[in-house]
């Protein structure tokens, strides 16, 4: 079993090792946040199992997912558990690894680029900067609901760290911001929410800790998004780059044959476009071994 980090969103940000694992997989057990275009790296006959979890809508319980991974491996299959971001950064990869260990199933961890760093980067927000931020912390915005109380030490967290990055925190934003302000973080502290970071549909909302809740409602910003708090947010004014691309925000339908589409798609994506491949033609060898083509070429002189 390979517990593979799919990266922060853009399918091309998966690691080389992650791509190699997909290429040899017999079974891919996939998360909601893992881009489906990654399946292009897999074999044609790969078994694809979706186990994604959205807020209030879970395809499968975590306990069942972990056991499914182990069961598929026990069938003698090469299994890739494809998880958004990094498996060990709020990805529950550790829990899955524990179950595999209990079932005597060999596994490897293939780290991925976390959205905690990549999403702010694509918004032009570095999580550290020598002049304004020498520390950062990554915090879950959605703790285990079965716990009796929060494990987050808000009193220390609010002021001890320069940059705070909350994952999965849109739904709990009122609680997060109120706790930060309560324990000493200024309501005027710059903040930003980055939705679908690194993807063509990326949205960036720049706000403050005090105004974040109201601004999210005003702009109807939905999950998934990372919430960044700190003076580094101001650097976006200078180093914003991704959403400045000429085709950013454009959806482009590519109708070329499958084998011809990839180069054009890549070029358009490099310019910021979101490409949808829908091949309208298929190039194949004719059934008559080119006899009809040869006949037409022989008569080419008759055409005006």
Predicted regions and their residues:
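Short hydrophobic/aromatic-enriched beta-strand-loop microsegments
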Residues: 46-53, 104-108, 127-137, 184-193, ...
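A contiguous loop/helix-start segment that scaffolds small-molecule binding in enzyme catalytic cores
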Residues: 1-3, 74-79, 140-258, 263-265
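Class I S-adenosyl-L-methionine
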Residues: 1-11, 16-113, 118, 218, ...
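Class I SAM-dependent methyltransferase SAM-binding "motif I" and its flanking Rossmann-like core
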Residues: 10, 86-160, 205, 290
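Surface-exposed, charge/polar-rich loops and edge strands
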Residues: 187, 245-304
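A polyampholytic, Gly/Pro-enriched intrinsically disordered region
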Residues: 71-73, 126-138, 209-221, 295-303
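Short gly/pro/ser/thr-enriched loop/turn and capping motifs at secondary-structure boundaries
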Residues: 36-37, 55-57, 114-118, 135-138, ...
